[in-house]
Amino acid sequence: MEVVMPELVPIEIPPNTVMLKGLDWDSNIYFVRSGREALIVDTGTGKRARDYIGLLAGEGYLNGLREVVIFNTHEHFDHIGGNLTFKSLLEGLGIKVSFATHRIVAEIIERGLSGIILDHAYGERFKPHEVHIKLKDGDELKVGKLRLNVIHTPGHTAGSSCLYLDGDTKLMFTGDTVFNRAVGRMNLPTGSLDELRKSLRKLTGFEVDFGLPGHGWIIKDWKGNLKRVMP
């Protein structure tokens, strides 16, 4: 599988995380490996899926991998549109794939609710699919030896969630809840300013070395950034 995007460069975040910076309308994509299993956070629109998977394969990140869990932070098309293409490409490499997300988002994905997914804004039609792991606030997502905490953070959408990886390096995958110096839009279906404020206050209770947002660049001053962007 060849990479056809020379501008796409993997950004390594120690000890075992790779950031693929979203291009065009795609969300950022994150890859976290633990032994023969791995987590992928969000998949973009799908238009560049072959390039993203090709890069991961070409750089050796997929070598010896047996299983991948794809976690969607929320239901917008720029984060879930690549789900089935990622699945097909990974399964073509002999890797088992399952999908995980908050149970509110899972229902939207399984029903293919276009008015909430916003696929029409990209000139596309999302194909509904099964979600294998349906989560709620406080649940633990297990991937290899990794244990990630699910944090329900409504505001951008009702089902938006962050994933927290507590370890020597503490990571928070934020989706579109909070960016570097910005927050996600609240004027889309199921968005809420009041809920977002509550979610941001909730996130201040976590110690985070790197916030890994759905768009833009890494958040290094976690609590300072939350204070700056609080609406």
Language-model regions: role of each:
Residues 2-8, 12-15, 38, 45-47, 103-154, 158-229, ...:
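Metallo-beta-lactamase
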Residues 6-58, 162-175:
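Conserved beta-strand hairpin/beta-sheet module of binuclear metal-dependent hydrolase folds
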Residues 21-23, 103, 136, 154, ...:
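Residues at the C-termini of beta-strands that transition into short coil/loop
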Residues 35-38, 62-67, 144:
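Short, surface-exposed connector motifs at secondary-structure boundaries
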Residues 47-50, 55-140:
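Active-site HxH/HxHxD metal-binding segment of metal-dependent hydrolases
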Residues 115-120, 190, 229-230:
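Short, hinge-like loop/turn segments at secondary-structure boundaries
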